């Protein structure tokens, strides 16, 4: 596929709608804005706040990664790029309405449902994705109240699993500079098991994640089997060496938490026993050896998929013209990020994905497959409800959160949508009427684009 083309003087620019303000959506907007600096680009987000995975999926103590949002702040400062939050596509407006209003529509809403393990079920079995959203004070998880107990078992050995291990094992005083609500770690387990089907050398986590665990100075770690380092693959060598370094004997007079890694074991069942539960594991290779773990709770970290109530079904928009290899769903309709390729790869992969999909969009406009003629947000404004949030509204929310730095936190997130909306609209009790707010939307967009 060709490289991104340079903008031609006099070229008519398309109006563009992007669904989802996470990394996939923002990188898509960033790339298309570079191609067409004056094109109207509108990013729609279900929540009143932007940045999706960066805000609610990245671990609260990984603020360096979350700082990527600052480059997206600069994107939204551009006159032709707009954020419209608190709009759920599929509920408040349809994809078809977006297609009627915009020349190009890109679906980049991600996939957030935890992949279930059919063999494990019960009221003490939690998905790691939901747990991470809870740690990040996601408004969808306000009623979520996990009871991890004194002993918890994490199924999975990818980076998300290691994030959960670290957040549960770190001392509560070690979260200075994070945006983790202190109330969420008032009760931490003293025993953590980590179970993975593959051997240590094939585990999905990065060695850096293990080195972070080694920084917890009042924890002890053990592992049942680790391949000796020396593998010709440098990543595998680094991974096994990090594990051996982690589990090497070290003086911890009074360990606060004990973490055990079990590689090469597959969970088979979870049965209630007395006050707790017994997790039955079978050896992945032999299928003969059995291991039993007494646990109070289980957290599954085995990947993601579709299934959350608000998610858009990609299959519904596939057509005979679809070419998912480069993000095409139908004429003028595209998809990017996890929504396109499935739940694989992190933020850097989403950046590459966005560039690839944008190349196809640019080629379609250049070839005449898409003829720019639609007015974008101006056509759609009458369909929007009065509680949408623009980027200025998000900046108000951001300022309030950043001002709340109790307990050494870098911010304290507003936990519910109603409170977010109050601060976004700078209101207390009065509500703007539908017609007045729709006029505000079109006036604001017009003023911004004339700057």
From Swiss-Prot:
| Residues the entry annotates as binding FAD | 24, 45, 53, 89, 338, 345-347
Q: Which family does it belong to?
A: Belongs to the ferredoxin--NADP reductase type 1 family.
Which InterPro entries does the entry mention?
A: FAD/NAD-bd_sf, FAD/NAD-binding_dom, Ferredox_Rdtase, Ferredox_Rdtase_adrenod
Q: Which UniProt keywords apply?
A: Electron transport, FAD, Flavoprotein, NADP, Oxidoreductase, Transport
EC no. given is 1.18.1.-
Q: Which cofactor does it need?
A: FAD
Q: What is known about what this protein does?
A: Involved in the degradation of cineol (eucalyptol). Catalyzes the reduction of cindoxin (CinC).
What top-level class of enzyme does the UniProt entry assign?
oxidoreductase
Query: For this protein, what is any one GO molecular function term?
Result: oxidoreductase activity, acting on iron-sulfur proteins as donors, NAD or NADP as acceptor
> Cross-referenced Pfam families, in alphabetical order?
Pyr_redox_2
Provide the binding site for NADP(+): 157-160, 197-198, 345
User: From what organism does this protein derive?
Assistant: Citrobacter braakii
Protein name as it appears in the record: Cindoxin reductase
Q: Give disulfide pairs as residue numbers.
A: none
User: What SUPFAM superfamilies has UniProt attached to this entry?
Assistant: Nucleotide-binding domain
